[in-house]
Protein backbone atom coordinates (compact mmCIF):
# COMPACT_ATOMS: atom_id res chain seq x y z
CA UNK A 1 0.00 0.00 0.00
CA UNK A 2 1.26 3.43 -0.92
CA UNK A 3 2.08 5.89 1.85
CA UNK A 4 -0.08 8.43 -0.01
CA UNK A 5 -3.21 6.30 0.48
CA UNK A 6 -5.48 8.46 2.69
CA UNK A 7 -6.38 5.34 4.63
CA UNK A 8 -2.73 4.41 5.19
CA UNK A 9 -2.36 6.57 8.31
CA UNK A 10 -5.13 4.75 10.14
CA UNK A 11 -2.69 2.48 11.95
CA UNK A 12 -1.38 5.53 13.83
CA UNK A 13 -2.85 7.73 16.54
CA UNK A 14 -5.13 10.59 15.53
CA UNK A 15 -2.87 13.31 14.13
CA UNK A 16 0.10 11.75 15.94
CA UNK A 17 2.13 14.18 18.02
CA UNK A 18 0.41 17.32 16.76
CA UNK A 19 -2.83 17.28 18.74
CA UNK A 20 -0.99 16.86 22.03
CA UNK A 21 0.98 20.07 21.38
CA UNK A 22 -1.77 22.18 19.85
CA UNK A 23 -4.72 21.45 22.17
CA UNK A 24 -4.61 22.77 25.76
CA UNK A 25 -4.25 19.91 28.21
CA UNK A 26 -6.39 21.29 31.05
CA UNK A 27 -6.48 18.06 33.05
CA UNK A 28 -2.71 17.93 33.11
CA UNK A 29 -0.54 14.99 32.07
CA UNK A 30 -0.24 12.65 35.03
CA UNK A 31 -3.55 13.71 36.54
CA UNK A 32 -5.94 11.09 37.91
CA UNK A 33 -9.66 10.98 37.28
CA UNK A 34 -12.47 8.92 38.72
CA UNK A 35 -13.07 6.79 41.75
CA UNK A 36 -9.89 5.73 43.56
CA UNK A 37 -7.81 7.73 41.03
CA UNK A 38 -8.61 5.12 38.44
CA UNK A 39 -7.79 6.87 35.18
CA UNK A 40 -4.34 8.25 34.39
CA UNK A 41 -4.53 11.04 31.82
CA UNK A 42 -1.83 10.71 29.13
CA UNK A 43 -2.56 13.48 26.63
CA UNK A 44 -5.29 15.57 25.05
CA UNK A 45 -6.16 14.27 21.57
CA UNK A 46 -9.00 16.52 20.48
CA UNK A 47 -11.25 19.45 21.24
CA UNK A 48 -14.76 20.41 20.15
CA UNK A 49 -17.57 22.75 21.03
CA UNK A 50 -18.74 20.66 23.99
CA UNK A 51 -15.38 19.81 25.50
CA UNK A 52 -12.20 17.80 25.08
CA UNK A 53 -11.17 14.19 24.56
CA UNK A 54 -8.18 12.71 26.37
CA UNK A 55 -6.16 9.56 25.89
CA UNK A 56 -5.88 7.88 29.29
CA UNK A 57 -4.94 4.59 30.91
CA UNK A 58 -7.01 2.43 33.23
CA UNK A 59 -4.43 0.66 35.43
CA UNK A 60 -7.05 -1.52 37.11
CA UNK A 61 -8.18 -3.14 33.85
CA UNK A 62 -4.83 -2.52 32.11
CA UNK A 63 -6.28 -0.88 29.04
CA UNK A 64 -6.23 2.51 27.35
CA UNK A 65 -9.44 4.52 27.21
CA UNK A 66 -10.65 7.81 25.81
CA UNK A 67 -12.13 10.30 28.29
CA UNK A 68 -14.66 12.77 26.95
CA UNK A 69 -14.90 15.80 29.26
CA UNK A 70 -17.69 18.36 28.90
CA UNK A 71 -17.08 22.05 29.41
CA UNK A 72 -18.69 23.38 32.61
CA UNK A 73 -20.36 26.31 30.86
CA UNK A 74 -22.35 24.49 28.16
CA UNK A 75 -26.15 24.91 28.10
CA UNK A 76 -28.44 22.28 29.57
CA UNK A 77 -29.46 21.06 26.12
CA UNK A 78 -25.84 20.12 25.42
CA UNK A 79 -25.58 18.44 28.81
CA UNK A 80 -28.57 16.26 27.94
CA UNK A 81 -26.96 15.38 24.62
CA UNK A 82 -23.69 14.49 26.37
CA UNK A 83 -25.46 12.19 28.84
CA UNK A 84 -27.54 10.64 26.08
CA UNK A 85 -24.41 9.80 24.12
CA UNK A 86 -22.95 8.07 27.17
CA UNK A 87 -26.13 6.18 28.02
CA UNK A 88 -26.66 4.80 24.51
CA UNK A 89 -22.97 3.94 24.19
CA UNK A 90 -23.15 1.96 27.42
CA UNK A 91 -26.41 0.25 26.45
CA UNK A 92 -25.28 -1.01 23.05
CA UNK A 93 -23.02 -4.00 22.51
CA UNK A 94 -21.98 -4.16 18.86
CA UNK A 95 -18.51 -4.40 17.29
CA UNK A 96 -19.18 -1.37 15.06
CA UNK A 97 -20.52 0.96 17.78
CA UNK A 98 -18.05 2.64 20.12
CA UNK A 99 -18.41 1.32 23.68
CA UNK A 100 -18.84 3.52 26.75
CA UNK A 101 -17.44 2.15 30.02
CA UNK A 102 -17.94 4.66 32.82
CA UNK A 103 -19.41 8.06 33.66
CA UNK A 104 -18.90 10.56 36.45
CA UNK A 105 -18.43 14.14 37.60
CA UNK A 106 -15.58 16.40 38.67
CA UNK A 107 -16.08 19.42 40.93
CA UNK A 108 -13.53 22.16 40.47
CA UNK A 109 -12.19 24.60 43.04
CA UNK A 110 -14.73 27.14 41.77
CA UNK A 111 -17.57 24.74 42.52
CA UNK A 112 -18.43 24.11 38.88
CA UNK A 113 -19.31 20.52 37.96
CA UNK A 114 -17.63 18.93 34.95
CA UNK A 115 -19.19 15.76 33.56
CA UNK A 116 -17.16 13.07 31.82
CA UNK A 117 -17.40 9.55 30.46
CA UNK A 118 -14.88 6.98 29.29
CA UNK A 119 -15.08 4.98 26.10
CA UNK A 120 -12.86 2.69 24.10
CA UNK A 121 -9.73 4.37 22.80
CA UNK A 122 -9.44 4.16 19.03
CA UNK A 123 -6.29 5.07 17.11
CA UNK A 124 -7.30 6.29 13.69
CA UNK A 125 -9.48 9.05 12.27
CA UNK A 126 -13.06 9.93 11.45
CA UNK A 127 -14.15 9.81 7.82
CA UNK A 128 -14.41 13.59 7.59
CA UNK A 129 -10.64 13.85 8.15
CA UNK A 130 -9.96 10.90 5.86
CA UNK A 131 -11.90 12.60 3.06
CA UNK A 132 -10.05 15.87 3.64
CA UNK A 133 -6.72 14.03 3.45
CA UNK A 134 -7.80 12.27 0.26
CA UNK A 135 -8.92 15.54 -1.32
CA UNK A 136 -5.60 17.19 -0.45
CA UNK A 137 -3.87 14.34 -2.31
CA UNK A 138 -6.25 14.50 -5.26
CA UNK A 139 -7.55 11.03 -4.48
CA UNK A 140 -10.76 9.16 -3.75
CA UNK A 141 -11.17 6.15 -1.51
CA UNK A 142 -11.10 2.77 -3.28
CA UNK A 143 -14.56 1.32 -3.93
CA UNK A 144 -13.80 -1.87 -1.99
CA UNK A 145 -12.76 0.17 1.05
CA UNK A 146 -15.97 2.21 0.81
CA UNK A 147 -18.07 -0.96 0.64
CA UNK A 148 -16.22 -2.42 3.63
CA UNK A 149 -16.75 0.75 5.66
CA UNK A 150 -20.47 0.90 4.89
CA UNK A 151 -20.96 -2.79 5.49
CA UNK A 152 -19.96 -2.12 9.09
CA UNK A 153 -21.81 1.20 9.41
CA UNK A 154 -25.05 -0.30 8.12
CA UNK A 155 -24.68 -3.32 10.39
CA UNK A 156 -24.32 -0.93 13.35
CA UNK A 157 -27.38 1.05 12.25
CA UNK A 158 -29.43 -2.11 11.83
CA UNK A 159 -28.48 -3.16 15.35
CA UNK A 160 -29.48 0.24 16.76
CA UNK A 161 -32.76 0.14 14.86
CA UNK A 162 -33.48 -3.33 16.24
CA UNK A 163 -33.00 -1.73 19.66
CA UNK A 164 -35.64 0.88 18.65
CA UNK A 165 -33.12 3.72 18.38
CA UNK A 166 -32.64 6.06 15.40
CA UNK A 167 -29.21 7.72 15.28
CA UNK A 168 -30.33 10.92 13.45
CA UNK A 169 -26.77 12.20 12.96
CA UNK A 170 -25.11 9.83 10.48
CA UNK A 171 -22.34 11.71 8.68
CA UNK A 172 -18.60 11.28 7.95
CA UNK A 173 -17.56 12.99 11.21
CA UNK A 174 -19.45 10.34 13.20
CA UNK A 175 -17.88 7.36 11.43
CA UNK A 176 -14.48 6.40 12.82
CA UNK A 177 -12.08 4.16 10.90
CA UNK A 178 -8.94 2.41 12.01
CA UNK A 179 -6.92 -0.61 10.96
CA UNK A 180 -6.41 -3.83 12.84
CA UNK A 181 -2.64 -3.80 13.59
CA UNK A 182 -2.38 -7.51 12.79
CA UNK A 183 -4.71 -8.10 9.83
CA UNK A 184 -4.62 -4.53 8.41
CA UNK A 185 -8.36 -4.85 7.82
CA UNK A 186 -10.47 -1.71 8.22
CA UNK A 187 -12.47 -1.47 11.42
CA UNK A 188 -15.32 1.01 11.50
CA UNK A 189 -17.12 2.46 14.53
CA UNK A 190 -20.31 4.50 14.58
CA UNK A 191 -20.03 7.40 17.04
CA UNK A 192 -22.17 9.95 18.87
CA UNK A 193 -25.73 8.95 19.69
CA UNK A 194 -26.17 12.33 21.38
CA UNK A 195 -29.31 13.27 19.43
CA UNK A 196 -30.55 9.71 18.90
CA UNK A 197 -34.30 9.13 19.06
CA UNK A 198 -35.73 6.34 21.20
CA UNK A 199 -38.63 4.97 19.17
CA UNK A 200 -40.27 3.66 22.31
CA UNK A 201 -41.15 7.30 23.01
CA UNK A 202 -42.73 9.97 20.77
CA UNK A 203 -41.47 9.59 17.18
CA UNK A 204 -42.62 12.98 15.87
CA UNK A 205 -40.23 15.91 15.87
CA UNK A 206 -40.86 18.68 18.36
CA UNK A 207 -37.58 20.43 17.54
CA UNK A 208 -35.28 20.17 14.54
CA UNK A 209 -31.86 18.71 15.24
CA UNK A 210 -29.06 17.26 13.20
CA UNK A 211 -26.77 18.42 10.41
CA UNK A 212 -28.91 19.93 7.61
CA UNK A 213 -26.69 18.35 4.96
CA UNK A 214 -27.57 14.82 6.13
CA UNK A 215 -31.16 15.25 7.33
CA UNK A 216 -33.92 13.30 5.61
CA UNK A 217 -36.82 15.37 4.24
CA UNK A 218 -39.04 14.27 7.12
CA UNK A 219 -36.41 15.55 9.58
CA UNK A 220 -36.57 19.06 8.17
CA UNK A 221 -40.12 19.80 9.34
CA UNK A 222 -41.60 20.09 12.81
CA UNK A 223 -44.01 17.21 13.35
CA UNK A 224 -42.29 14.93 10.84
CA UNK A 225 -42.60 11.22 11.60
CA UNK A 226 -39.15 9.71 12.13
CA UNK A 227 -38.12 6.08 11.87
CA UNK A 228 -35.09 4.03 10.83
CA UNK A 229 -35.43 5.11 7.21
CA UNK A 230 -34.19 8.59 8.15
CA UNK A 231 -30.83 6.98 8.96
CA UNK A 232 -30.92 5.12 5.64
CA UNK A 233 -31.29 8.48 3.88
CA UNK A 234 -28.32 9.95 5.77
CA UNK A 235 -26.28 6.84 5.03
CA UNK A 236 -27.08 7.28 1.33
CA UNK A 237 -25.84 10.87 1.28
CA UNK A 238 -22.76 9.88 3.25
CA UNK A 239 -22.10 6.99 0.84
CA UNK A 240 -22.22 9.44 -2.08
CA UNK A 241 -19.78 11.80 -0.36
CA UNK A 242 -17.32 9.11 0.72
CA UNK A 243 -17.36 7.49 -2.73
CA UNK A 244 -17.04 10.64 -4.84
CA UNK A 245 -15.34 13.05 -2.45
CA UNK A 246 -18.21 15.54 -2.86
CA UNK A 247 -21.47 15.96 -1.00
CA UNK A 248 -24.58 15.71 -3.25
CA UNK A 249 -25.38 19.34 -2.34
CA UNK A 250 -21.79 20.60 -2.22
CA UNK A 251 -22.79 23.81 -3.97
CA UNK A 252 -24.96 24.75 -0.97
CA UNK A 253 -22.18 24.77 1.62
CA UNK A 254 -22.48 28.54 2.06
CA UNK A 255 -26.24 28.69 1.51
CA UNK A 256 -28.85 29.40 4.20
CA UNK A 257 -30.20 26.41 6.10
CA UNK A 258 -33.61 26.90 4.47
CA UNK A 259 -32.03 26.35 1.04
CA UNK A 260 -30.43 23.11 2.20
CA UNK A 261 -33.76 21.93 3.65
CA UNK A 262 -35.47 22.74 0.35
CA UNK A 263 -32.88 20.67 -1.52
CA UNK A 264 -33.40 17.73 0.84
CA UNK A 265 -37.13 17.85 0.17
CA UNK A 266 -37.20 18.42 -3.60
CA UNK A 267 -33.85 18.47 -5.41
CA UNK A 268 -32.54 15.35 -7.12
CA UNK A 269 -28.71 15.31 -7.03
CA UNK A 270 -26.42 14.45 -9.90
CA UNK A 271 -25.90 10.65 -10.03
CA UNK A 272 -22.69 9.67 -8.23
CA UNK A 273 -21.40 7.83 -11.29
CA UNK A 274 -21.11 11.21 -13.05
CA UNK A 275 -18.32 12.10 -10.61
CA UNK A 276 -16.43 8.82 -10.93
CA UNK A 277 -13.70 8.17 -13.48
CA UNK A 278 -14.53 7.21 -17.05
CA UNK A 279 -12.77 3.92 -16.43
CA UNK A 280 -15.51 2.87 -13.98
CA UNK A 281 -17.14 -0.29 -15.39
CA UNK A 282 -20.72 0.38 -16.53
CA UNK A 283 -22.05 -2.37 -14.26
CA UNK A 284 -20.53 -0.72 -11.19
CA UNK A 285 -21.60 2.77 -12.25
CA UNK A 286 -25.21 1.60 -12.62
CA UNK A 287 -25.10 -0.20 -9.28
CA UNK A 288 -23.71 2.84 -7.46
CA UNK A 289 -26.45 5.03 -8.93
CA UNK A 290 -29.17 2.53 -8.05
CA UNK A 291 -28.05 2.19 -4.44
CA UNK A 292 -27.82 5.94 -3.95
CA UNK A 293 -31.18 6.55 -5.62
CA UNK A 294 -32.90 3.96 -3.41
CA UNK A 295 -31.25 5.15 -0.21
CA UNK A 296 -31.90 8.85 -0.82
CA UNK A 297 -35.48 8.72 -2.11
CA UNK A 298 -37.49 11.69 -0.86
CA UNK A 299 -40.41 9.42 0.05
CA UNK A 300 -39.46 7.01 2.88
CA UNK A 301 -41.68 4.34 1.28
CA UNK A 302 -39.43 4.34 -1.80
CA UNK A 303 -36.16 3.93 0.13
CA UNK A 304 -34.48 0.79 1.31
CA UNK A 305 -36.77 -0.14 4.17
CA UNK A 306 -33.92 -1.02 6.50
CA UNK A 307 -30.19 -0.54 6.89
CA UNK A 308 -29.81 -4.28 6.34
CA UNK A 309 -31.56 -4.01 2.95
CA UNK A 310 -29.10 -1.33 1.90
CA UNK A 311 -26.14 -3.35 3.17
CA UNK A 312 -27.26 -6.46 1.29
CA UNK A 313 -27.69 -4.48 -1.93
CA UNK A 314 -24.17 -3.09 -1.61
CA UNK A 315 -22.70 -6.53 -1.00
CA UNK A 316 -24.58 -8.03 -3.96
CA UNK A 317 -23.99 -5.30 -6.53
CA UNK A 318 -20.68 -3.72 -5.48
CA UNK A 319 -18.61 -6.70 -4.36
CA UNK A 320 -16.03 -8.12 -6.79
CA UNK A 321 -17.45 -10.58 -9.32
Task: Report each predicted region and the residues it spans.
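AlphaC helix of the eukaryotic protein kinase fold
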Residues: 71-91
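Conserved short submotifs of the Hanks-type protein kinase catalytic core
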Residues: 110-126
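C-terminal lobe helix-coil module of Hanks-type protein kinase domains
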Residues: 213-321
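Activation-segment/catalytic-loop signature of the eukaryotic protein kinase fold
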Residues: 103
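Protein kinase catalytic-loop region centered on the HRD/HxD motif
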Residues: 154-165
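Conserved N-lobe ATP-binding subsite of Hanks-type protein kinase domains
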Residues: 52
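Activation segment signature within eukaryotic-like protein kinase domains
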Residues: 149-150
Amino acid sequence: MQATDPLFALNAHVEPGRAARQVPDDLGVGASLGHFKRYEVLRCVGEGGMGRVYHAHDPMLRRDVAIKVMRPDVPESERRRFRREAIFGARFCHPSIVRVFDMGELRGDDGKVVEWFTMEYLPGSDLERVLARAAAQGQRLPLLSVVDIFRQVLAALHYAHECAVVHRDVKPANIFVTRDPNTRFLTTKLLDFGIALDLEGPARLEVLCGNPFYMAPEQTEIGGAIDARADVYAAGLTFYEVLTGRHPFEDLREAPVEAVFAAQRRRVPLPPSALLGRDTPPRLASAVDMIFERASAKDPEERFQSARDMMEAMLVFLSPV
